[in-house]
Amino acid sequence: MRHTPPEFGKRVSSGTMVSMLKTTIDLSAIAYNVRLIKEKVGPEVKLMCVVKADAYGHGAAKVVPVMASAGADCFGVATLREAVELRRAGVDSPIVAWIWQTEEILEEALACGIEVAVNSLEQAHQLVKSEIPAEIYVKVETGMHRAGVDEDDWVETFKVLRDAPHIKVLG
């Protein structure tokens, strides 16, 4: 069954490298889609909207507040910098960053409440060493060779995190 969105109103436009091209982002369509998904999954299910890469070029600073008001519970981004930028832009919803390097702005991100995914034993040790309270997820390598804690390090990684009183593993 196809749903017809409501009349569209708010539009955000951004130019591209070629002046003949223009992208028009319909914020009311985005809000409609978020409301529809939330309606379908039910209020007990948390909805994370992934807005990495500036909301895939849609403009995260404009799109995220619309998604939040339409029912998005939290947001996912790739990097700590993206997460901190959203927080600085006034986003107070939970934000999860799942790809980060040990030299990145970890302490700043944790200080402003960014949830992170741990992808390695080294990252687990860095979180413990930071002594900053953190809510985290552990991403495990399951054979796709993308990112995540290697199988050989699973036990030690979970032990390191479990033994740290300032770290809460959410998933």
Region roles according to the model:
Residues 40:
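Conserved PLP-enzyme active-site core in the AAT-like
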Residues 3, 13-17:
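Short, positively charged and aromatic/hydrophobic N-terminal segments
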Residues 9, 21-24, 29-32, 45-171:
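Active-site-proximal beta-alpha core segment in soluble small-molecule metabolic enzymes
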